[in-house]
């Protein structure tokens, strides 16, 4: 699904990604954990073909970057992020935002069929946001906007769905509701490969069986959640002693 081989990326002579390696296989769901400035979002931009590494090899969905037509490939990758929200037209109704995902556009310019509208409503209903269909996007809460954005991504029937810090700015209730939505996606038949990016350990749901730790643009560690979500590994990663508890199959940490 994703093959990143020894990539290096510079911006203004600063090394952003440093000999990073990462491989995602079919039917795997991954969490990427890293502090601010670790290179997480830059890696996502590389995967989506928005920026190119200076060295190394990138393959996504069997296509090698530099040898394929990126805009066409990009339609097979859903990306949910706060940066994407800012690019949407906030004056559109929620269902128009969702329908735009069908065409890989930021606005709905195409004529849509009754079947496509029904599909959008069905997807929104799965994520408990169909009642928002005719609401103006601008007046939705942050949590509601994230549900609409996820519905928009699913509308395109992607092979990979990237969730870039989707809980950022949410209160604890909205966060848990959104995480429940993500669990629902993971439990769906023919679910896309999920990539969940965060700097909060407790957001790594049980469905994310593999974890990539990123630090200073490097792959600090990769492995199963059982291998990575341990006190020794996380203490070394954060550079501080942490205690870890497992509650509801999720890891919760505190600095000692």
What feature does the model see in each segment?
Residues 56-66, 73:
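Conserved ABC transporter NBD signature motif
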Residues 48:
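Helix-to-loop junction immediately C-terminal to a conserved catalytic motif
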Residues 161-164:
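Catalytic Walker B motif of ABC-type/P-loop ATPase nucleotide-binding domains
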Residues 99, 114-132:
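Conserved ABC ATPase "signature" region
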């Amino acid at each position: 699904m994703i093959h990143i081989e020894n990539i290096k990326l510079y911006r203004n002579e600063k090394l952003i990604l440093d000999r990073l390696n990462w491989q995602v296989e079919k039917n795997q769901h991954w969490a990427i954990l890293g502090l601010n400035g670790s290179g997480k979002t830059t890696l996502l931009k590389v995967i989506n073909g928005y920026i190119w590494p200076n060295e190394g090899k990138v393959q996504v969905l069997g296509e090698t970057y530099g040898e394929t037509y990126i805009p066409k490939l990009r339609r097979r990758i859903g990306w949910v992020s706060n940066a994407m929200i800012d690019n949407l037209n906030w004056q559109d109704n929620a269902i128009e935002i969702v329908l735009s995902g069908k065409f890989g556009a930021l606005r709905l310019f195409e004529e849509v069929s009754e079947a496509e509208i029904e599909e959008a409503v069905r997807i929104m209903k799965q994520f408990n946001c169909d009642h928002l269909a005719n609401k103006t996007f601008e007046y939705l809460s942050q949590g509601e906007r994230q549900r609409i954005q996820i519905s928009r991504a699913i509308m395109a029937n992607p092979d990979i769905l990237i969730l870039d810090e989707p809980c950022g700015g949410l209160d604890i209730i909205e966060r848990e509701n959104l995480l429940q939505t993500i669990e629902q996606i993971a439990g769906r038949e023919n679910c896309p490969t999920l990539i969940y990016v965060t700097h909060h350990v407790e957001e790594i749901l049980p469905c994310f069986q593999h974890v990539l730790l990123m630090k200073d643009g490097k792959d600090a560690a990769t492995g199963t959640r059982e291998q990575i979500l341990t006190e020794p590994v996380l203490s070394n990663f954060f550079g501080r002693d942490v205690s870890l508890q497992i509650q509801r199959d999720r890891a919760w940490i505190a600095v000692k």
